[in-house]
């Protein structure tokens, strides 16, 4: 008996691979979590209808603190599927879950699916030029994270692009927009004053990756702050040093100002 970590892809229930679908249908029990990412184009009911089985949705607490009791205990005697948005091994949490399964002597298998790490190529930015990614988190009382700012600075110094994931608080139904992320980064800029993220910084926003009509826009922060990017999820990129083809792509497909062509 085993646990199968199955990716659901980026947007709706049709993004799961045939291998993932066939495996989920064969499993005795199916669990899922949606707090690490969002499938904006579908619902749990639609996924259940496609798979033909009931799915137990787990909370963050159940995944991180009770996974052994709820899921792995079942995998000792049954085949269990664990569904996640995107690719299952992109989230560090899921890597930890697989380690726990190994420690309990339970076989585990990974079935990949489309991920933002591949879909980000629709921006026209060359994938091999991306540096370390970071998450822009919602500030809280007595806690204002700034590590994402430092990551942008470090990548810029090396000419690399920075992909920024935007905070998700699924239990509160809060999904950060690119506009909110820009506001937060401008606040950090005021605090640090290093010129890393200013109104003149070029940013690229991708919304609803994986859908038939994703939104792709590029421009300077001062012009993008009030843009309507539509429904979440959003992801944002702060480009490093652009190649001429990257710049032309952003102008052609993301509406970037032609001025960037003179800056490469």
UniProtKB/Swiss-Prot annotation:
It catalyses: 2-[(3S)-amino-3-carboxypropyl]-L-histidyl-[translation elongation factor 2] + 3 S-adenosyl-L-methionine = diphthine-[translation elongation factor 2] + 3 S-adenosyl-L-homocysteine + 3 H(+). SUPFAM superfamilies: Tetrapyrrole methylase. S-adenosyl-L-methionine binds at residues 10, 87, 90, 115-116, 166, 209, 234. It is an enzyme of class 2 (transferase). This is Diphthine synthase. Its EC number is 2.1.1.98. S-adenosyl-L-methionine-dependent methyltransferase that catalyzes the trimethylation of the amino group of the modified target histidine residue in translation elongation factor 2 (EF-2), to form an intermediate called diphthine. The three successive methylation reactions represent the second step of diphthamide biosynthesis. The keyword Nucleotide-binding does not apply. Belongs to the diphthine synthase family. InterPro entries: 4pyrrol_Mease, 4pyrrol_Methylase_sf, 4pyrrole_Mease_sub1, 4pyrrole_Mease_sub2, Dphthn_synthase. Homodimer. Pathway: Protein modification; peptidyl-diphthamide biosynthesis. Pfam families: TP_methylase (PF00590). CDD domains: DHP5_DphB. One of its GO terms (biological process) is methylation. One of its GO terms (molecular function) is diphthine synthase activity. HAMAP family: Diphthine_synth. Keywords: Methyltransferase, S-adenosyl-L-methionine, Transferase.
